[in-house]
Amino acid sequence: MRTIRVTGKGQLRLKPDITRITMTLEGVYPEYSETLQHSSEDTEALKDVLSGFGFARSDLKTLSFSIDTEYESYREREVYKQRFIGYRFQHMLKVEFSSDNERLGRILYALSNCAVSPEFRLSYTVSDPEAARNELLGKAVQDAKEKAAVLSRAAGVSLRCIESIDYSWGEIDIEYRPMERMAKAAQPLMAASYAMDIEPDDIELSDTVTVIWEIE
């Protein structure tokens, strides 16, 4: 049996319509139980802040959580040593909402001035990532079909049935990150918002699929 193998490439440009704020809470405390308690209290405080902007407490989603031992280096008689100082927690969370610069400015101002002072970064995504992935895959298959048709005509053969379709099924990152980290910015005391004027660029995606046809 003779076959032809063709790899098709799909490309897609998406206009992001969802704003994502990723926040990180951190702290170091002498006792493990104390570290857990503070991590829980800080998370609840963050939920309190966000609830003032129309978010349900369940809208704040955990991306990762860890507690690790923390050591510090010191020098003793020309020898560097380490000593245990406690436990460090790191809690990464996210919240998403339909893109709105005015709302975003108020949220970022509140985060910058709240007691727990999380580190945060801003990114953008789309409201229906699954539909985007399916459209991208469809474009890749269509590209493979068109290439196979051109090649088979040029070679004087006919395409028959598809023998196999090979696709990696890897996760496609549908996210645009204009800034990786945001720090506190100076703002007049009477203000309650940052003036945000962000127009995120389109998200460009690409993926490939390999199709094998029988030919005659």
Question: Can you annotate each of these PLM segments?
Answer:
Residues 1-216:
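Short, charge-dense linear interaction motifs
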